[in-house]
Amino acid sequence: MGKIIGIDLGTTNSCVSVVENNAPKVVENAEGGRTTPSIIAYVEDGEVLVGAPAKRQSVTNPKNTIYAVKRLMGRKFTDPEVQKDIGLMPYSIIAADNGDAWVEARDRKMAPQQVSAEILRKMKKTAEDYLGEEVTEAVITVPAYFNDSQRQATKDAGRIAGLDVKRIINEPTAAALAFGLDKQDKVDRKIAVYDLGGGTFDVSIIEIANVDGEKQFEVLSTNGDTFLGGEDFDQRIIDWIIAEFKKEQGVDLSKDVLALQRLKDAAEKAKIELSSAQQTEINLPYVTADASGPKHLNLKLTRAKLESLVEELINRTAGPCLTAIKDAGVNVSEIDDVILVGGQTRMPAVQDKVKEIFGKEPRKDVNPDEAVAVGAAIQGSVLSGDRKDVLLLDVTPLSLGIETLGGVMTKMIPKNTTIPTKHSQVYSTAEDNQPAVTIKCFQGEREMAAANKLLGEFNLEGIAPAQRGMPQIEVTFDIDANGILHVTAKDKTTGKENKITIKANSGLTEEEIQRMVKDAEANAAEDKKALELVTARNTADALAHSTKKALEEHGASLEASEKEAIEAALKELDEAIKGSDKEAIEAKTEALGKASQKLGEKVMAAEQAKSGGAAPGAAPGGAQQAAPDADVVDADFKEVDDKK
């Protein structure tokens, strides 16, 4: 059985970890980073860039550079949060045929799952390059407060990326695993995980206990806000810059897509700098232009000003924390440790708020960017059977129920119930001789069903004619370990049954997922072809370069016909390199190798004469073995090949 890798699929950054020799390791990507920006760019020639390369070109290609797509996962286009994002994002957010929020780039309409799959493919490839073997299984993390649709969407993204998602695990729970397994003591402890990431906020109260030599992680409660995170902090800075620039220059930058992308980069940079400095300068020359000429932006932003801009956002995290403490049935004084997760928790004002809420200093010995991926990898090693000393008991974040007479939400499974779990309840008909019932499944805490999230609906037909209230319809809610809901309705009189895995009345159909899997596979094949072409070009370039050099130095000792044959072969190879036919490049490379064989012999003879004998390891062959700097060219070629 291969490794089950752990992936933190973040709003702003993603991270991948593997467990080796019982120790988790965060894997560096091809660019050398331990985290990868969750940014995907669709460029003119059809290439898809992921991570740092996508971020680098975002200023010049804002409409086709997708970021923070996690905020759209499993959401309807009409959701208020999505509508708010439409006005802020430089790329197009559109309504799919089923009402879901999708994105559009280069005239391609794509589900958020498809875009997220590009990030997951990059994480998969990063792990494969490190392990030297194919990876097909993963544990992927989600915010604890993700609902059923969002969890299903994350699982679908994994499938599109070619991964069998063995488990969806909550981010705070994963961070608790990373923290708890690090502790060698046998002391039971209650911890609070405060997770303020790029797009979401979660808080979980978790008890870590030692039971018969096994570490048991039991989630007591969880709460959060799936539309609150570092991206919102950045937006407050962007809004402030726009207002200040309009005051000074009379120009509104909010309609300038290129300028907005530069502002986003500058805002993020300023926010990060102000975590350690008291003041920073935002300097953007030539940010825009009007009839009077180019305009430059130069503003000073202090930490105090930043804190006043985002104070309301920080305060919004207090409510979910207090609710989680209450739901866990503990006092604040009983919480032993507070763990910070997510890059936004590096902000001093956030740390001060955490101290104020929990009455103690948060711990600084957990890496907020990597703990979630590490925990996911640990859970992967548990699922693969490599680790047997860990038991994880997670919960469902929101109540689940069905709509009953009068539009009431009748709860079947209350929030913070340990999963997996199953619950059955018997209902009846509302009218005489009613032949069918519609089961509508909701998730949320409101008393009226319509105010909660409709997850899906289905019919149970063929109910035997009877007076209202007589038929017995047993509805069973079954939540698996991923937090995904399966519902069954059964007429106890006739034995008729209907069941569904909740996929919402939106979400991707099986056909759509299969099509997207095929698209992703086609992209992988295209990537392989592109890499092979680059490799062929590099090999050809190296040979052409060294042959030209050898021809300059030793061409005079060749017969005219030999020299002409080499020059003709060089010319043909140069032409082939300009094209995109790999076979032609390889054929012309081979032809040049044969044509320059005599030249190679002359070069070798000259080298031997110079050194007074055969060079160690010298071998007969083409001129590429003769050129003094051939090794340099080869090393360059290898570097390209490594990075793929």
Curated annotation (Swiss-Prot):
Low complexity: compositionally biased ranges: 612-630
Nucleotide-binding listed as a keyword: yes
Looking at the record, which segments are called Disordered?
603-644
Q: Which UniProt keywords apply?
A: ATP-binding, Chaperone, Nucleotide-binding, Phosphoprotein, Stress response
Q: Sorted alphabetically, which Pfam families does this protein's record hold? A: HSP70 (PF00012)
Q: Which residues carry this modification: Phosphothreonine?
A: 200
Q: Where is the composition biased (Basic and acidic residues)?
A: 635-644
Q: What induces it?
A: By stress conditions e.g. heat shock.
The GO molecular function terms of this record are: ATP binding; ATP-dependent protein folding chaperone; unfolded protein binding
Give the family per the record. Belongs to the heat shock protein 70 family.
Q: Which HAMAP family match?
A: DnaK
User: What job does this protein perform?
Assistant: Acts as a chaperone.
Q: What is this protein called?
A: Chaperone protein DnaK
| Species | Polynucleobacter asymbioticus (strain DSM 18221 / CIP 109841 / QLW-P1DMWA-1)
Quick one: which gene encodes this?
A: dnaK
